[in-house]
């Protein structure tokens, strides 16, 4: 069977998005293109420090773009010489990530939103019945504040199937319902975007990415992608 073209993939994404906005920050050329090229390049990938730093840089730039969508209110700041009126963000931001690949990406967001609270989860799917028909979430570790009425940013570098993002979302929201959710990824696959659309609140979620690649392979890796982000950041695992 012929694989869908990249054009058809993007057309499909635009068709399914409806209320949920999908923003690819690489649609306009910027220094993000350079960071993405280095992340993908198998020769650059040998340098873990450079790889982590580029993931962090993309997180910083994506955080800046997200900051343009926040609510702002007028505040007065006193300088040594007088007073200055300025517009400051009024959102109460929670930066969340899923261990382990998300840590450098999370750091980039925290560098920008340095007053934000952080949330972390380590979770995986498990069957809750003997027939293996009902899937639940086993949370090994969860640290999160009350999310009620707050702006939640879930940063995970690879949005492949969307399963990990859903697990993280369900774990975090046991601590309350956020005002808005920003799903942030370095690279997204159409399958992952569709899964988020099916499992997240459509009118309260925005998907951000630095690239939308064409497909998943049989091992559920994004193609062309970059490989295993966690291994490239921290080394291979057993």
Regions found by a protein language model. Give the residues of each.
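PRPP-associated nucleotide enzymes
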Residues: 5-238
